Each structure stands twice: as structure tokens, then as C-alpha cells.
Amino acid sequence: MKRLLLLTLTILCVVPIACAQNKSGIANPAIDMPGYLRVAAEAAEHRESRRLTEEDFIRMSREPGTVILDARSGEKYNELHIEGAINLSFPDITVESLRRTLPDKSTRILIYCNNNFVGAEPQFPTKMATASLNLSTYISLYSYGYRNVYELGPLLDIKASKLDFVSHSGR
């Protein structure tokens, strides 16, 4: 209940600010801040019950039809990623790239990002908590109609993690 109240207050405070941003008179129908904030609020509520422990992430990743999605850059993905993950770099997420990569919107998708790991900073450079790639990826997938998305929750030491990692960089 506290989360819902906080979410409602956030929306009530942020949406008017976002709407006021268009007072400049510079219209762009391809950019919709109020719509983004609305979808982000919906996605935030949806996400709360979909954050996984390391053990649940591993178990679910082994189930047929599950896709592990790494939305980091292709370069960082090639340096080190969770075994079995596919790469679709966040800036490249579009209707068409999702249609090619994840044609069935009901596919179970597991996501992770830089902020899930310590001990391999060159491959998983930490972002500010409010700019975590998990947040952006979750909201983006939700915006495109993907609702069967789960997120690796904890911060893990890569050297102690039970996840298997692979590299394609030859380093």
C-alpha cells in the first residue's frame, strides 16, 4: 500500500512537470514524456513481483522457452555475459528488432544489467542506481507489450556467483 501511495504521489508530482516541458512550443509527436511516465509507473508496479533471486533466475533460465536478454552494448556483451544470453543493445530496441529477436510477446524474458555484478567492473561498469539498465530495459519491454519479463534482483560478486559466464572477445 505504501508503494502504491508513493507511486501515485510521484506521478502527481512528475506528470505536471513533464507536461509543462512542452510550454516551449516545440512539438515532437515521436517523443511523449507524459506517456513515458505513465508507462514507467505501470511498469514499476508490474516489476515489483518479478525480481528474482540468483537461484530463481538460474532455475527459470533452464526452463524451455525462456530467453535471457542482455541489453548492454555488443562490446560489453562480447567481453563477458551470462551463458545462454542473447544480446539486444538497449539503443537498438525497436519494434522491428524486437520482432526479429523476440517475436512472441508472451516469451518469458529474464534480464540483468551492470548493476547486478561487482568484481568485473570493466565488463559490468556500475551505473547510477537511478540510471540502471534494468530499469530502462524493463520499462522499454513493457512499453512494447512484453509482460512476461523477470529481472535478476540482487547485487552479486561475480567471483562468488552461481551463474555461468562466457566471453566472446578472446581475452
Q: Can you annotate each of these PLM segments?
A:
Residues 59, 76-79:
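Short, solvent-exposed loop/turn elements at domain surfaces
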Residues 56, 72, 136:
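Short Gly/charged-rich anion-binding patches and loops
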Residues 64-69, 105-108:
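Short coil/turn segments at beta-strand junctions that form active-site/ligand-binding loops
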Residues 67-72, 85-88:
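Short hydrophobic beta-strand that contains or immediately precedes a catalytic carboxylate
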